Amino acid sequence: MSDLPDTDFTQRFLFDDRDVRGEMVALERSYAEVLAKHAYPRPVQHLLGELMAAAALLVGTLKFDGLLVLQAQSQGPVPLLAIEYTSEHDIRGLARFEAEQIKDDARLADLMPGGHLVLTIIPVNGQRYQGTVELDGQDLSECFTNYFVMSQQVHTSISLTADGVRARGLLVQQLPAEIHKDIEEREESWAHVKALANTVKAEELLGLDNETVLHRLYHEDAVRLFDIQPLRFRCSCSRERSSNALVSLGEQDAKALVEECGGTVEIDCQFCNERYLFDASDVAQLFAGGGTDVPSETQH
């Protein structure tokens, strides 16, 4: 990580007198990197920021080594949103959109009507997990809250917001019974935490530090705030991966593709717009066992 001030991080907190944990996320530089790759309309900027924040919060609830992929799809003006977040806290994202169909005040239902979001966990070791989030809430916060209640059967409340410069998120989640084992007490305790979490305003999340937000919400509770976990924008594309894609076609088809493309194949990364060019000599070298001219899988 750099020596610049921390603007991109997650931060856990815990209630000492309740079976509840929480997590907050702040995104600025990584959010700006994602938005800089394409000319996104403002409503799409907001959706991307909220989904980035959601990905960071979700990884905080999981214990795995690997990759979390969020893909929202619809038949509306925004047919695709995609976020990838690794257990090393690297994040990247993109959206596809029809700009002429997007109004400045468009909301989730306008942008992605009838949409759904697929959540995929790809561990380094172990089986892939996939879950589905219906985009039938008023906003992404409500959609993800419903997902946890319906699919994971865990009391969870999520608040997400983004303004094109900053993206923020707050998650509170009930833990297994340790402090309040009585069912009624346990439900009352959760209801208290959730009710206060639901009062947080977008301007508070965007404009205040985490400690201040938590004090405003839970000043009567014993809350411990842990150290931050920095995160960053990092794209996993590389010349080596692009080379492997060509090799997977087979030598005959790869050489035919070069000819069809006028002598040079261009492979573009949709996430970061990096371009990788391969001419006939490059392709011949790949199949001669010469490898690529970039020996390692450089990421940026």
From Swiss-Prot:
The keyword Transcription does not apply. Keywords: Chaperone, Cytoplasm, Disulfide bond, Redox-active center, Stress response, Zinc. GO terms for cellular component: cytoplasm. It is found in: Cytoplasm. One of its GO terms (biological process) is protein refolding. Under oxidizing conditions two disulfide bonds are formed involving the reactive cysteines. Under reducing conditions zinc is bound to the reactive cysteines and the protein is inactive. The keyword Chaperone applies. InterPro entries: Heat_shock_Hsp33, Heat_shock_Hsp33_C, Heat_shock_Hsp33_N, Hsp33_helix_hairpin_bin_dom_sf. GO terms for molecular function: protein folding chaperone; unfolded protein binding. Disulfide bonds join 235-237, 269-272. It comes from the Bacteria. Its main location: cytoplasm. Pfam families: HSP33. Redox regulated molecular chaperone. Protects both thermally unfolding and oxidatively damaged proteins from irreversible aggregation. Plays an important role in the bacterial defense system toward oxidative stress. Belongs to the HSP33 family. This is 33 kDa chaperonin.
